[in-house]
Each structure stands twice: as structure tokens, then as C-alpha cells.
Amino acid sequence: MNKSILLLTDEMNPGGVARHVVDLANGLVERGFQPIVAATDGPFRARLDEQIAFVNLPILARDGTHKSLIGFLASYRILNEVVRREKVTIIHSHKRYTDLLGRIVARRMSLSHISTCHNIFSSLKHVSFFGDTTIACSKVVQEMLIRDFGKKMQDVIQIYYGILPFREFNKKEKNQVFKALSISAGTKIIASVGQLIESKDRVTLVRAIGILRKRGEIDNVLFAILGDGEQKTMLEELVRNEAVHDHVMFLQGTSNVEALFNVADFMVLSSIREGLPYVILEAASIGKPHIATNVGGVSEFVIHGETGVLVPPNDPEKLADAIKDLLDNPEKVDLLGTSAREKFLQQFTYDKFIDRTGEVYKDYFTGHSHAS
């Protein structure tokens, strides 16, 4: 039985979807599938198992910031050739742009098409094209697909992300991280990881930091914001305007998240839209909790007062209060982190994620797909 599966996304730059595709591809190889990954090349390509074929698509323009019709048409031609040459049986697309691309290629070549929906959105519904079967990363996303996009319940499968846990650093390794980042030992670190884009709403985080500074509540506290994106210059200016430059450090998106999380006391997620963020699982895997905005599927992992702290989106005052509470109560941080790790181990492991996705593929191979 041919188990060649084309995993299609727009780019291999650092981000949750690229991470998801890489993890999925690597896990499928271990289980006897033959995944092929197709996307615009980027740093995350290096994380792919050496057995996995990679197809570089011109989806992103040379400046790496936008997509074009020329790139779409060129990618379409390349994918048709790859599908024929590699005898692909299933196209599994991620993100709306490549959902459309995958849909057209699948119909042209009479292939099965699966898509994964990673986020909550309401705009451009008329140009959203999902697969015969759509995998939803959270229950909230599943409900959105059925309610807002007219997907049939039997055609939407909810599968949580799963990751390999981060490694816990020893004291010597943590000291080395402090030294590498030029941070004084004993400084409390609060980490925020994700792209510097509108949906992640770091503006609210920086304003919350400004509130804490005015109250005199963040002496010996450093906020490490890791990520790249279009808002970086604006956020750097906001940091200066809020006079919190001594309390904020920006780190590139290619920086070591595992190392940062090992030295952080806890994390903050200030997004206004999310499906189910990888960073919450990564932190939980080593017992570090999040203060997170109650959006999308976040509350499916962050249970307020149990596995983390939930705050309303776009509310700097509430976010500042939550940060202050955890700074003042390290024992609460430890309890939240322990519970977060337990939830991770129960529901969000790598093996569960790979096995459940593999079952969806096998349904297509055996003619028992969920698609109508």
C-alpha cells in the first residue's frame, strides 16, 4: 500500500504551524508513512528527519513577507509534478492559502484532501477552502468550522496537538543561559514567545509592564519577548515610550525557546486570537504555567486557578494584576506548573497526536474516510 502523503504549508519560518508540520512529518516516518513536505524554505526545514523529502515552493515572495499570484501558479505546477512523480495519495494542507492550493491540486489529480485548521477566524469565509476531512486543533475550532463554515460534523475531527517534552536543565545549564543572555543571577524572568504580529497583541503586554513599572512592582524582573514580525519596530518604540526598556528584552525568533523556558519563572500569552498555542504545551512539559488570554482554545488547556491563569484579552490592567499576583506567590506558580505538566502528560503527548492523525490517513487508505 502506497503511504505517500504530501504535507503542505506556506513557509518553514519559526512558528506554530511550521513546528506542527515538522513534528507530524517526523512522527509519520517513524510509523511507516512516506511524508513529503512542501513549503517556502526556512529555518525549520533543518528539523525534518533526513528521510523526508522537501519541496521548496515559491509561495512567499523574495522579501519573505507576502504571497503573490505568480507564486501560487508556480507552486501549483510544481505540486502537480511532485504528485505524479511520487505517487502521492493524500494531500494534507495547513493554513488557508495552502488549503486552497491543496484543494485545487487534489481535485485536478483526483486525490484525497485533508486540512488542519489551526486558528479561530471570521474574515474571508467565502475564500476558505478546507479538505474532505478537516482536523481541528481544539474543540472551539471544531465548533467554529461546523457553525460558521457549514462543515458537517462527521467531516471535522478534533485532534489536540502533541509534542515531545522539553528537557529540564540542571542548575549549571541554567546559569549558562543567564550568562549567555547577560542577565544577573536571581533576576525573575517572565517569558512571552510568539510572532510579533497583531494577533499576538504584545501591545497589551507592554502596556501591562508599564503599569507595573509605575506601581514600582517589577524591580529585578525582566520580560523576555521572543519572536520576529512586522510589529517589532513599533513595539520597541512602545517600550521606550512606556519607559520599560530596563525591564524588556527582545530575542530573535530563532532563539532557543527551550533554554528560555527553563530559566523563566512563568509565561505570558496576550493574544486576541488563538487555536491552541504550542507555547503553552512547551512550557507545561517542564512544569511552567502561563498567564493567558481567554481566547480560542486556550481555556481547553489553561484552566483558571488550576493549570494556569486566564485574563480577558486587550486588558492591560487585568494582565498586570495577574502578573503581580504570580510574582508575589511563587508557591502558586509551582502548584500551577505541576498541574499543567500533569494535564500535558494526560492529553497532549506526541504519540497521541501522531497516532490519532495516522488513524485519519488509514481511514482513507482503507476506504472508510470521514468525508461524505
What are these model-derived regions, one by one?
Residues 143-147, 154-155, 162-180, 186, ...:
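Acidic anion/phosphate-binding donor-loop and adjacent secondary structure
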Residues 18-23, 188, 192-214, 223, ...:
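A conserved mid-protein helix/loop that constitutes part of the nucleotide-sugar donor-binding site
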Residues 318, 325, 332-362:
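A short, well-ordered alpha-helix in the C-terminal region of glycosyltransferases
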Residues 304-305, 309-316, 325-330:
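Conserved acidic donor-binding segment of nucleotide-sugar-dependent glycosyltransferases
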Residues 93-99, 117:
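Short His-centered aromatic/hydrophobic patch
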Residues 253, 272:
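Aromatic "clamp/platform" in nucleotide-sugar-dependent glycosyltransferases that forms part
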Residues 289-292, 302:
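Short hydrophobic beta-strand element within catalytic cores of glycosyltransferases
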Residues 7-15, 19-71:
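N-terminal strand-loop element at the rim of the active site
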